[in-house]
Swiss-Prot record:
Cofactor: [4Fe-4S] cluster
Record's catalysed reaction(s): chlorophyllide a + oxidized 2[4Fe-4S]-[ferredoxin] + 2 ADP + 2 phosphate = protochlorophyllide a + reduced 2[4Fe-4S]-[ferredoxin] + 2 ATP + 2 H2O
Assembly information from the UniProt record: Protochlorophyllide reductase is composed of three subunits; ChlL, ChlN and ChlB. Forms a heterotetramer of two ChlB and two ChlN subunits.
Gene Ontology biological process: light-independent chlorophyll biosynthetic process; photosynthesis, dark reaction
Protein name: Light-independent protochlorophyllide reductase subunit B
Upper taxonomic lineage: Eukaryota, Glaucocystophyceae, Cyanophoraceae, Cyanophora
Binding of [4Fe-4S] cluster, residues: 36
Listed Pfam families: Oxidored_nitro (PF00148)
Family note: Belongs to the ChlB/BchB/BchZ family.
A GO term for molecular function: metal ion binding
Keywords: 4Fe-4S, ATP-binding, Chlorophyll biosynthesis, Cyanelle, Iron, Iron-sulfur, Metal-binding, Nucleotide-binding, Oxidoreductase, Photosynthesis, Plastid
Pathway: Porphyrin-containing compound metabolism; chlorophyll biosynthesis (light-independent)
UniProt GO cellular component terms: cyanelle
Gene: chlB
InterPro entries: ChlB/BchB/BchZ, Nase/OxRdtase_comp1, Protochl_reductB, Protochlorophyllide_Rdtase
Length: 440
């Protein structure tokens, strides 16, 4: 345990709460002391939704420490069951309350006897895994719970849909441009006449999870969230998964070809549509020329963030734009092997760390023309006078835009080109107020 000024990923209970609050009509009970209960405020501020965050804190106070938590936790579960009438209540401790070593599974079993909702204890180790790993684990646990429950009651849907269909897995609350990406992916599916069978966890109910086996294919745009679920569905039902982030021309084209091949939809007409769409995007090449023409030497970039976004963007900037990637890195240590394999041929140096001071020191030493990173790299860039485009969580409210800004699909290519053009070209333009300072 160490005191941290900045964390790229939060503690495990944040991951569990992200998944629980993504589902419709699911409520989370957080067994925690005051101070660990910042999730509600953070999510309300960033997501700006109409509804309240469905998370209640069962506060660990001096009375709980004296008498034990059982009565209070069970009372809170039953109270929320009566008030909110959810389909599922998820109980999670935090790393702090886990120190008490209480039998929370016993609390859940007792509460289930009098609760109309299903009650589930989040099965995560709060000392060994981080927010992203807890997201993945909690989603798999909820899917497994409802698959097994409905299999026992013989209500599980196993017959495939007549038309090609997919499950979209990994869209969650507080994800990087997740809601916009979902809309763009839905447009892609509609364009190629593919049915969206189920999108989870964001915006779906646990009752619809019985329909997961009906799909022909699982789509996982974000590698960090959904791999465990896809492995479980593959093991139980033989459902294959496509794990590609369709960001940029090359990856989008690769995604579409693999998607249509997997669904046996490839034909001359569809291939022609893909090529026409791709040609329109290639007309944006003038932005590439504008972005790199100001100096004769190649522009140098540093990229840091989540493994999936950084790996995809590194290839995009190197192959499609022609930037020299002098360093790329990730804070996802659990994905270090996969990440290194993906980027080793596209950058000069790889950095895998959760320490923001290491990336700050590298940026200061290497002096890139542009940075692409998280909110922390934005701060570092501002301090050093280097422009930064934000391409990955963790992020602040600027990167939860109300306007439509997907990072994937056809519109996502335009978003990335805007980000690239503004980051590279506008850094040397003087602000009007600075220019006319004496007059103003």
């Amino acid at each position: 345990m160490k005191l941290a000024y900045w964390m790229y990923t939060g503690p495990a209970h944040i991951g569990t709460l992200r998944i629980a609050s993504s589902f419709k009509n699911v409520h989370a009970i957080m067994h925690a002391p005051l101070g660990d209960d910042y999730f509600n405020v953070m999510r309300s501020m960033l997501e700006r939704e109409r509804n309240y965050t469905p998370v209640t804190t069962s506060v660990v106070d001096r009375n709980v420490l004296a008498r034990g938590s059982q009565e209070k936790v069970i009372d809170n579960i039953l109270r929320k069951d009566k008030e909110e009438q959810p389909d599922l209540i998820v109980l999670t401790p935090t790393c702090t309350s886990s120190i008490l070593q209480e039998d929370l599974q016993n609390f859940v079993e007792q509460a289930s006897l009098n609760s109309m909702a299903d009650v589930l204890l989040a099965d995560v180790n709060h000392y060994r895994i981080n927010e992203l790993q807890a997201c993945d684990k909690t989603l798999e646990q909820i899917v497994r719970f409802y698959i097994e429950k409905n299999r026992a009651s013989l209500t599980l849907e196993k017959v495939k849909t007549l038309l090609p269909s997919v499950n979209l897995i990994g869209i969650s609350s507080l994800g990087f441009h997740n809601n916009h990406d979902t809309r763009e992916l839905k447009k892609l599916f509609e364009l190629y006449e593919i049915i969206l069978n189920c999108s989870l966890p964001q915006g779906t109910t646990v009752k619809t999870l019985i329909n997961l086996p009906k799909a022909w294919l699982n789509i996982l745009p974000y590698r960090e969230l959904g791999l465990l679920t896809s492995k479980y569905l593959n093991k139980e039902f033989g459902l294959l998964s496509l794990v590609i982030l369709p960001m940029g021309n090359i990856n989008l084209n690769r995604f579409l070809k693999k998607l249509l091949f997997s669904l046996k939809l490839e034909n001359n007409t569809i291939t022609k549509v893909i090529n026409i769409k791709l040609l329109k995007l290639l007309n944006l090449n003038w932005i590439k020329k504008e972005a790199i023409k100001s100096k004769l030497k190649r522009k140098k970039a540093i990229i840091f963030g989540s493994s999936n976004h950084v790996a995809t963007l590194t290839k995009l900037l190197s192959k499609e734009i022609g930037l020299e990637i002098i360093l790329c890195g990730t804070y996802c240590k659990s994905e270090s092997k996969w990440f290194s394999e993906q980027v080793q041929n596209y950058c000069n140096k790889i950095l895998i760390t959760e320490d923001h001071t290491m990336i700050s020191n590298e940026i200061s030493k290497l002096k890139p023309d542009v940075i692409f990173g998280t909110q922390m790299e934005r701060h570092i860039g501002k301090r050093l006078g280097i422009p930064c485009g934000v391409i990955s969580s963790p992020i602040h409210i600027q990167n939860f835009p109300l306007s439509y800004k997907p990072m994937v699909g056809y519109e996502g290519v335009k978003t990335i080109m805007d980000l690239l053009f503004n980051s590279l070209n506008l850094k040397d333009r003087k602000n009007s107020f600075t220019l006319f300072n004496e007059i103003i």
